């Protein structure tokens, strides 16, 4: 690694957490999940795919899908058929604990964060993660200027 690259990496570190960039579908051919390509994952039976997942996700899927998750998968399959016909479909869900499966790749799913629906474009690199990981529920606190009504304690100070 050259010194220029090291400086760029250090600069990224100073910026804090960086939102991952969306990788275009043309570059998906380089993707591998535990040594398997996206095509292999799509053609793989669910039992074999579950064996590739980390323990937490593997245990969750082995116990079976919740009814809400089944409904979401039905919505996704229906949406894929409609999208093949050229229609635009919005998939909204409250299922933040749904594990991203290979059949979801390429879709934009709107995940509820407690206030609004956050659009999440699913790329192959999201496989095995939870939908809720990509729809942040908290907001970074931005404090106002100090003064009257800036804090709860200043409510009791008489205004001049």
Swiss-Prot record:
The organism of origin for this protein: Pyrobaculum islandicum (strain DSM 4184 / JCM 9189 / GEO3)
Biological processes per GO annotation: ribosomal small subunit assembly; translation
Domain of life: Archaea
InterPro entries membership: Ribosomal_uS19, Ribosomal_uS19_CS, Ribosomal_uS19_euk/arc, Ribosomal_uS19_SF
UniProt function note: Protein S19 forms a complex with S13 that binds strongly to the 16S ribosomal RNA.
UniProt KW Translocase keyword: no
GO cellular component assignments: cytosolic small ribosomal subunit
Family statement drawn from the similarity comment of this UniProt entry: Belongs to the universal ribosomal protein uS19 family.
GO molecular function: rRNA binding; structural constituent of ribosome
Keyword terms of this UniProt record: Ribonucleoprotein, Ribosomal protein, RNA-binding, rRNA-binding
Name this polypeptide is given: Small ribosomal subunit protein uS19
């Amino acid at each position: 690694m050259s010194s220029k690259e090291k400086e760029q990496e250090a600069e990224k570190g100073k910026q804090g957490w960086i939102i991952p960039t969306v990788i275009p579908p043309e570059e998906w051919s380089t993707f591998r999940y535990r040594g398997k390509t996206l095509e292999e994952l799509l053609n793989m039976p669910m039992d074999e795919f579950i064996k590739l997942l980390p323990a937490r996700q593997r245990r969750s899927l082995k116990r079976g899908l919740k009814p809400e998750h089944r409904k979401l998968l039905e919505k996704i399959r229906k949406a894929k058929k409609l999208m093949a016909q050229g229609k635009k479909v919005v998939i909204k869900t409250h299922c933040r604990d749904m594990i991203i499966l290979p059949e979801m790749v390429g879709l934009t799913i709107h995940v509820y964060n407690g206030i609004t629906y956050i659009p999440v474009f699913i790329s192959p690199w999201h496989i095995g993660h939870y939908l809720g990981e990509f729809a942040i529920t908290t907001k970074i606190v931005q404090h106002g200027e100090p003064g009257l009504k800036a804090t709860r304690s200043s409510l009791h100070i008489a205004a001049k």
